[in-house]
UniProtKB/Swiss-Prot annotation:
Keywords: Isomerase. InterPro entries: NTF2-like_dom_sf, SnoaL-like. It comes from Aspergillus carbonarius (strain ITEM 5010). Belongs to the aurE cyclase family. GO terms for molecular function: isomerase activity. It comes from the Eukaryota. It holds the Pfam family SnoaL_2. This is Probable cyclase otaY. It is an enzyme of class 5 (isomerase).
Length: 123
């Protein structure tokens, strides 16, 4: 297998976020996550792949108006940074959202860290 290009990794990163949030299809991203991935978020404990797959539908159930809009994506080597705007996550208003993802040589995410901050009030 050839090493994924930055364009491919950017596509994987944006697909993960839009599929999880806008399409609300948690299981549809499993093939892009490494079996031993570590997922971190500024307001949640670290999670494994199986913990994310079990937990994420709960977030969606509590966030019927949750949406993400990708604003910018930067790839360098095996790392991708995604800047987006989200709204409706767990009743929050509009937030800046940054995800930093590290990919392996097969194009699977091995580590993801997300940080959000509210920029407009609660919904």
């Amino acid at each position: 297998m050839t090493t994924p290009t930055p364009t491919t990794l950017k596509h994987h990163a944006t697909t993960i976020l839009t599929t999880l949030v806008n399409d609300r299809q948690t299981a549809a991203i499993e093939h892009l996550l490494h079996p031993t991935i570590t997922l971190k978020h500024n307001d949640l404990p670290a999670m494994s792949k199986s913990e994310l797959i079990a937990f994420w539908p709960e977030v969606l159930a509590q966030s019927p108006h949750f949406r993400v809009q990708i604003r910018d994506v930067i790839a360098e080597g095996n790392k991708v940074w995604v800047y987006s705007r989200v709204e409706g996550r767990l009743g929050e208003g509009v937030m800046d959202d940054f995800h930093m993802m590290v990919f392996d040589e097969e194009g699977l995410v091995v580590r993801s860290t997300g940080v959000q901050r509210v920029v407009e009030g609660e919904m």
